[in-house]
């Protein structure tokens, strides 16, 4: 009886905890690390670009050409992320979730070696190519890790474990900021080491992850290997009797037989998945277009205007990164208590208020002496709000609102939206800042407001529900009679259990 109760509630076993940590550290950590790794040593890297150009051509590089090369260095990362997102469906269907993560380490170890040797080889081209490769790595990992952990976790731990990838992204950013202090590796000799360290987590994952189970859902639904799926569940749960969870996966398999293989194109045309698709696109776009990258872009300027010495800005920036890590840890503990929907509403609302107040503070900072301090508070409040909901929850929800056959295609679309939005903000924000000045954040406040309204009106709470139950909630919105109806019929008489939800 006790074992049956354990199966219904689920526990954080040692195997599940280690699988989560190894997957997140080996993949998500690299994403965060490579976001921040080039920021601190940028002036030394650009000097290296100039010196290399001079050695080849016996003249200094033109300012425009240097700016173009550095823009390529930075923008190759989100562009690679977009390419990586397009590869997700094929990789997870052919290699499995765990197999895709192991394969993905190629896109980390190879560029780590190239970046580490770039100074010796006198080639800035190696850095630009490597930034594309680590971007591909981040694009794959940002989609596959939440999918893998969401399929490993029991439903009562799915939210907490689903936030862990975002935690390791923030830890990766913080570690890059700390290693990127001038006194450590952000200097003339240390920057190749700083860039090359991204290969260390990949190497550890390559050594350790093979000893942990593949996703039981992938094994049963896609590989049709019930024995392997049951063994994987028993290893993850720590007990032999997993028949209730196996039965739930079988029901999901039965529900999906009518749909068959779902490609990206088919996902766009299926009425039974329409509102799941729209919700995913809104959340992934809202996550990036809410201004998170712009806040970090503007942060140094805000700190300087508040009187922080230029040499000390790096420490304040690292402090902001520490706040981000702390709030993401807090989210792990409250996501199963407060739910996904509530955290999204609170997070986007907090970002909305922070953007509005920041706009006023920036507009008045030359008039009122203490306004720069309000700006600093706004940056910190924004980081807190984004860490509570907009950063960690959207990727978790993709796992929850789609079933096994549609999940890879959903992650391809969601990941593509994420990286294109990221790239767009990075590309156009400097021009928005030039045109609107302190009023730039009105645009992000508007996006936060619209996203909050959408979440309130459309996105359901998924806490504590099975994947089938969550998809049944959407049947009424989609005006279909079942999760995957054989014919996309208009909504008729729905089962009473669905109407109650």
UniProtKB/Swiss-Prot annotation:
Xref: Pfam families: Sugar_tr
Keywords annotated in UniProt: Acetylation, Cell membrane, Glycoprotein, Membrane, Sugar transport, Transmembrane, Transmembrane helix, Transport
Activity control, per UniProt: Fructose uptake is inhibited by cytochalasin B.
Ranges facing Cytoplasmic side: 1-17, 91-97, 149-160, 213-276, 334-341, 394-411, 460-501
One example of a Gene Ontology biological process annotation: cellular response to fructose stimulus
GO molecular function: fructose binding; fructose transmembrane transporter activity
Residue ranges crossing the lipid bilayer per the database entry: 18-38, 68-90, 98-118, 126-148, 161-181, 192-212, 277-297, 313-333, 342-362, 371-393, 412-432, 439-459
Domain of life: Eukaryota
UniProt GO cellular component terms: apical plasma membrane; plasma membrane; sarcolemma
Segments on the Extracellular side according to the record's topology features: 39-67, 119-125, 182-191, 298-312, 363-370, 433-438
Expression tissues: Detected at the apical membrane of villi in the jejunum. Detected in jejunum mucosa. Detected in epididymis and whole testis (at protein level). Detected in small intestine, kidney and testis. Detected in cochlea, but not in inner or outer cochlear hair cells.
CDD domains assigned to the protein according to its UniProt record, in alphabetical order: MFS_GLUT_Class2
Protein residues bound to D-fructose: 31, 166, 287, 295-297, 386, 418-419
Carbohydrate attachment residues: 50
Location(s) in or outside the cell: Apical cell membrane; Cell membrane; Cell membrane, Sarcolemma
Residue positions where N-acetylmethionine is found in the record: 1
Known catalytic reactions: D-fructose(out) = D-fructose(in)
Induction remark: Up-regulated in jejunum by dietary fructose intake (at protein level). Up-regulated in jejunum by dietary fructose intake. Up-regulated by dietary fructose intake in small intestine and testis.
Membrane topology of the entry: Multi-pass membrane protein
Disruption phenotype: Mice fed a standard diet appear normal and healthy, and display no visible phenotype. Mutant mice show reduced food intake when kept on a high-frucose diet and about 28% reduction of their body weight within seven days. They loose more weight than wild-type mice that receive similar amounts of high-fructose food. Mutant mice show strongly decreased fructose absorption in the jejunum. Contrary to wild-type, mutant mice have a strongly distended colon and caecum when kept on a high-fructose diet. Their intestines look normal when they are fed a standard diet.
Function description: Functions as a fructose transporter that has only low activity with other monosaccharides. Can mediate the uptake of deoxyglucose, but with low efficiency. Essential for fructose uptake in the small intestine. Plays a role in the regulation of salt uptake and blood pressure in response to dietary fructose. Required for the development of high blood pressure in response to high dietary fructose intake.
Family listed: Belongs to the major facilitator superfamily. Sugar transporter (TC 2.A.1.1) family. Glucose transporter subfamily.
Descriptive protein name: Solute carrier family 2, facilitated glucose transporter member 5
Organism per entry: Mus musculus (Mouse)
């Amino acid at each position: 009886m006790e074992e049956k109760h354990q199966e219904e509630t689920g526990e954080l076993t040692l195997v599940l905890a280690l699988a989560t940590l190894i997957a997140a550290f080996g993949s998500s950590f690299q994403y965060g690390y490579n976001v921040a790794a080039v920021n601190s040593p940028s002036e030394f890297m650009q000097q290296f670009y100039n010196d290399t150009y001079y050695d080849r051509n016996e003249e200094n590089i033109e300012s425009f050409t240097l700016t173009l090369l550095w823009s390529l260095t930075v923008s190759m990362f989100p562009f690679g992320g977009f390419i990586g997102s397009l590869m997700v469906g094929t990789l997870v269907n052919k290699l499995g979730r765990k197999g895709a993560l192991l394969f993905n380490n190629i896109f980390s170890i190879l560029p780590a070696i190239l970046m580490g040797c770039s100074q010796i080889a006198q080639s800035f081209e190696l850095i630009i190519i490597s930034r594309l490769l680590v971007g591909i790595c981040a694009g794959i990992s940002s989609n596959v890790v939440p999918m893998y952990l969401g399929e490993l976790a029991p439903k009562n731990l799915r939210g907490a474990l689903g936030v862990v990838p975002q935690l390791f992204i923030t830890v990766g950013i913080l570690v890059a900021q700390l290693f990127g202090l001038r006194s450590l590796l952000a200097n003339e000799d240390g920057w190749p080491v700083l860039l090359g360290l991204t290969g260390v987590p990949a190497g550890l994952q390559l050594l350790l992850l093979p000893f942990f189970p593949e996703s039981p859902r992938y094994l049963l639904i896609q590989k049709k290997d019930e024995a392997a799926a049951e063994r994987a569940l028993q290893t993850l749960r720590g007990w032999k009797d997993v028949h209730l969870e196996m039965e739930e996966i079988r029901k999901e398999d039965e529900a999906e037989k009518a749909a068959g293989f779902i490609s990206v194109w088919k996902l766009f045309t299926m009425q039974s998945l329409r509102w799941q698709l729209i919700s995913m696109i809104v959340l992934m776009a809202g996550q990036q277009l809410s201004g998170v990258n712009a806040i970090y872009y503007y942060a140094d300027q805000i700190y300087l205007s508040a009187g922080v010495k230029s040499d000390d800005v790096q420490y304040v920036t690292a402090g902001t990164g520490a706040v981000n890590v702390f709030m993401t840890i807090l989210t792990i503990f409250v996501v199963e208590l407060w739910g996904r929907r509530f955290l999204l509403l609170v997070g986007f609302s907090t970002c909305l208020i922070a953007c509005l107040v920041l706009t006023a503070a920036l507009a008045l900072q030359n008039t009122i002496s203490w306004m720069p301090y309000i700006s600093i508070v706004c940056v910190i409040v924004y980081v807190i709000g984004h860490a509570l909901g907009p950063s960690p929850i959207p990727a978790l929800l993709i796992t929850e609102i789609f079933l096994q056959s549609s999940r890879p295609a959903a992650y391809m679309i969601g990941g593509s939206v994420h990286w294109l939005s990221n790239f767009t903000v990075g590309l156009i924000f400097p021009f928005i800042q030039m045109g609107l000045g302190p009023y730039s954040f009105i645009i992000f406040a508007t996006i936060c407001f619209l996203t909050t309204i959408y979440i309130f009106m459309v996105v359901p709470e998924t806490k504590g529900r099975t994947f089938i139950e969550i998809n049944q909630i959407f049947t009424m919105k989609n005006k279909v009679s079942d999760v995957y109806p054989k014919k996309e019929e208009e909504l008729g008489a729905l089962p009473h259990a669905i109407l109650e939800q």
